[in-house]
Amino acid sequence: MEDPFYEVKADASNQMEQVRKLYNSFMAARNSGVLSPNTELTYAIDELSETLKDLKAAVEIAMKNSEHFGLDEEELKSRRRFVSELDIELNNIQLKMGAAPSTPVSTEPYTVDNGASAGLSEEDHAVNRQYQEQLYQQQDVMLDGVYDTIGNIRGQAALMGEELGQQADLLDTLDNSIETTNSKLRRGMKRLKDFTIASADSKSGCCITVLIIILIALLVLVIVL
């Protein structure tokens, strides 16, 4: 059996370098106000996450077969530290992007399942504690982001409620204005109708009076003649 660690490590290192470049470009664009798509960066992160799984499996194989590969405790410790640092850096990049890590963030430090955890050195325990603290901090950042999002949604909902209330008041005012205008129009139409009728009656009376005067004048002329 060949030691698979260094081949997978080389792939992980190259992929991490690519992720760093894409991440720096993404952050520079976002800081300048340009919302550029990050599809390529997301793909690179997903690919690196899969490679990290293979790398952790390679570490486990190495620890279970350390004598076969001729590995001492210092080499195994170095491999575990490399994986932990790479894992932490990747999770930090994802959190700064505002996205959830590609793989669920565990609250337990990275360890290998070979029954040898009881024999870890103090330095290994320190690395594990540091990794666990990093994970707790990442979870706090994620929770803060969730709380901020919920607060923003509540604020927007309250603002929308106020705007809807104002619009309802405006509609009520408009309805009242329309009703008042209609009432004034009805009164005006009634007055105009009454005036028209009165004017018509007055003109008829004048015509009758004129006709009577003309008839009287004709009668007088007939009698005189």
From Swiss-Prot:
Stretches assigned to the t-SNARE coiled-coil homology domain: 133-195
Membrane spanning stretches: 205-225
Presence of keyword DNA damage: no
Alphabetized Gene3D superfamilies for the sequence: 1.20.5.110, 1.20.58.90
Record InterPro entries: SNARE, Syntaxin-6/10/61_N, T_SNARE_dom, Tlg1p-like_N
Pfam families registered for this protein in UniProt: SNARE, STX6_10_61_N
Domain of life: Eukaryota
Alphabetic keyword roster: Coiled coil, Endosome, Golgi apparatus, Membrane, Protein transport, Transmembrane, Transmembrane helix, Transport
Gene Ontology annotations for the cellular component aspect, listed alphabetically: endomembrane system; endoplasmic reticulum; endosome membrane; Golgi apparatus; Golgi membrane; SNARE complex
Membrane topology: Single-pass type IV membrane protein
One GO BP annotation of this record: Golgi vesicle transport
Locations listed in the record: Golgi apparatus, trans-Golgi network membrane; Endosome membrane
Stretches of the chain forming a coiled coil according to its record: 38-68
Membrane topology, Cytoplasmic segments: 1-204
One Gene Ontology term of the molecular function aspect: SNARE binding
UniProt family annotation: Belongs to the syntaxin family.
Descriptive protein name: t-SNARE affecting a late Golgi compartment protein 1
Phylogenetic lineage: Eukaryota, Fungi, Dikarya, Ascomycota, Taphrinomycotina
